[in-house]
From Swiss-Prot:
Gene symbol of the encoding locus: hutU
Protein name according to UniProt: Urocanate hydratase
GO BP: any one term: L-histidine catabolic process to glutamate and formamide
Record key words, sorted: Cytoplasm, Histidine metabolism, Lyase, NAD
Note accompanying the cofactor annotation: Binds 1 NAD(+) per subunit.
Function, as annotated: Catalyzes the conversion of urocanate to 4-imidazolone-5-propionate.
Annotated source species: Shewanella oneidensis (strain ATCC 700550 / JCM 31522 / CIP 106686 / LMG 19005 / NCIMB 14063 / MR-1)
Amino acid sequence: MDKRHDPSRRIIAPHGSQLSCKSWLTEAPMRMLMNNLHPDVAERPEDLVVYGGIGRAARDWDCYDKIIEVLKRLEDDETLLVQSGKPVGVFRTHADAPRVLIANSNLVPHWANWEHFNELDKQGLAMYGQMTAGSWIYIGTQGIVQGTYETFVSVAKQHFGGISKGKWILTGGLGGMGGAQTLAGTMAGFSVLACEVDETRIDFRLRTRYVDKKATSLDEALAMIEAANQAGKPVSVGLLANAADVFAELVKRGITPDVVTDQTSAHDPLNGYLPQGWTMAQAADMRKTDEAAVVKAAKASMAVQVQAMLDLQAAGAATLDYGNNIRQMAFETGVKNAFDFPGFVPAYIRPLFCEGIGPFRWVALSGDPEDIYKTDAKVKELIPDNPHLHNWLDMARERIAFQGLPARICWVGLKDRARLAQAFNEMVKNGELSAPIVIGRDHLDSGSVASPNRETESMLDGSDAVSDWPLLNALLNTASGATWVSLHHGGGVGMGFSQHSGVVIVCDGTETAAKRVGRVLWNDPATGVMRHADAGYEIAKNCAKEQGLDLPMLKD
């Protein structure tokens, strides 16, 4: 019997202002854990899988039940420790300490690979937490939409003079992360053709308005893209097909998209990527009987896809890796120039990271969408001179369907996070919001991750693989009084390729929350400015000086 599989489970987080726990500081992690497994949020909630291959919220259902039980009894001077999705201890701390500390998927470096992890996973000794799956702050696909939108806007600026009309993006994957590409692309003015092997994922994206149309053949999909481009109105198409097949076929036909990327779950060749010519049922059976054959076939298909991406780049397409480690997998399979196209962070996002700008997100614990709309208005009020941000908030309200508890994401930095959070806390205090707000972020942020093939690729000083920074980030957020803090390994790019930390804090309207929020949401993005200033980025150095950061080794 698989203790991780229970199709009878249907998890819905409580709404409203009535507590199930002893305070909002423990109610919040309980609701957010449950929200990660909401049927409209998680990819396979019956298996505790939230997104990203096998990214889980808890190790098994017994562990999930025990976490909920402990959170309901946890006092406001106690801290729950969670080890790879398993609640292992409750300790007396103090009121300003985190209520939950989480460590997921961490392995001693020599053993930090999928083979060793999968053995531990099969024995029930580990859990893959991805980034926000095991840290209980996943908000559905919206969580990556703005970052993807910002990337595509930057692509348009760098390659097409800021004009995306009549241009189209080829990509793969419509899972929890990849599903953002279609909506983000059309928001940025591009048409998007996204390949996906799982028809249920395409149908889900249609239902939640992330995809406009479904196609079952490449010719049909290309006709949809061509018609939309002729009409000057972007369209997103989910094509039921294997990305490796489609990418290679476009090369064969001499058809060159304007932009090429990919967000299949290539980081996990065993569980996340379907080999060419295989059915999903065949892959599921083979994973039980011959894991090595699955991995070998998946990586061979990735090599085909990456070679096609290189060929399309040579034909003129703006080609980028979107952080799923597909280049590494292809490189290991013989594509020696796999890294000839850049990752999206060094190519398009790093200047934002230098100012601590990243994926700031918040969730209405009330379950009331009006609480989010009121906070949207507050963001506009406090940041009046940023039309790009205002446009994002308007588009998000109009086009993004909430999944589970209502949430919002917007990319803001060191200058704004703490003051926005304190304003939200004041709104809770004054009764403008019907219940507290939780504020968190993706682990993909400026100071919270070491990932040489993604966030820290091609650092100015060569410090791509130095992982002291996310450890310091987690320690500082703990010391600053965050409500829960997490430290993970392998998110986004797979085992052995990343370490990263997460933070969540509750705005419950109290004065103590205002103080904690001020510390945490200043210090957290400040570590990103610190990390990039230390690496020699002038934008970060200037930001540090302007904001008065005390960085002892920063020269005037």
